[in-house]
Amino acid sequence: MARIGVLALQGDFEAHAKALAGLGCEAVEVRRVAQLPGLDGLVIPGGESTTLLNLMADEPWFPALKGFHKRGGAVMGTCAGAILLAREVVNPAQESLGLLDVTIARNAFGRQVDSFETTLDAPLMGGTIEAVFIRAPRVQALGARVETLAAFRGEPVLVREGRVLAMTFHPELTRETKLHAHFLTMAQPAALTGRFS
C-alpha cells in the first residue's frame, strides 16, 4: 500500500487526504519535515502561496522537499502548490522549489469573485475531469519535457514532468478522484521498491 503525505500547513488538505484514503492508500497529514521519510508521494495543496512560504520558514522544507523528489518521491501540487513547484514564478516573483520546468503567473485568472467550475477534456485521465478554479495561476511557459494533460481555452492547466504532477485548479473540491488516482500510479514504483523505508 502506498503512503502518500498531504502537506497540512494550509489549504484543504483534509479533502485531499479523504480522496486518497478512499482510493485505498495510507494518507498522512504532514506538518513536519521529519514525516517525509517513508512516504512514496506528497501532495501540496492550494491556499495562498506567500502564506505557505511563511509557514514553511520554520523548518528546512525546501532542501527536504528537493531531496524527497531527487530520491524518487512523487509530488503533486494544486493551485498554490503548483506555484511552489514551478521553476519560475511571476506576478510577482517569489521563491519556488524549481521541481517543474514551467513559468507560472500568480492569480492570473482573476480575483476570488472570478472563480468558476468547468469540465476539461483529459483523454489520459479517462475522458474528462471536473475542475474548480479559485484565483488560479496561469502556466505561461513550458519546458521541453513538460507534458500537458489538460488545457482550458488553449492554455495548459494540468501538466506533468516525470514524477511531478501540477494543476492550476482544485480537484479536491469535486467528487472525482481521477487525478488522485493518477498520482497514485506515479507514486506506486516507490512503494514497490521501498526506497523511502
Regions found by a protein language model. Give the residues of each.
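Hydrophobic anchor at the start of a short beta-strand
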Residues: 27-28, 75, 164
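Cofactor-binding loop segments of dinucleotide-utilizing enzymes, especially the Rossmann-like FAD-
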Residues: 9, 80, 169
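N-terminal beta1-alpha1 cap of cysteine-dependent amidohydrolase-like domains
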Residues: 1-67, 177-181, 185-197
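Short coil/turn connectors at secondary-structure junctions
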Residues: 1, 38-39, 71-73, 94-95, ...
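Amide-donor transfer/coupling interface in amidating biosynthetic enzymes
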Residues: 106-197
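Redox-cofactor binding/interface segments in oxidoreductases and associated redox assembly factors
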Residues: 44, 77, 167
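Flexible, glycine-rich phosphate/dinucleotide-binding loops
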Residues: 13, 36, 84, 91, ...
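Cysteine-nucleophile active-site neighborhood
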Residues: 49-121
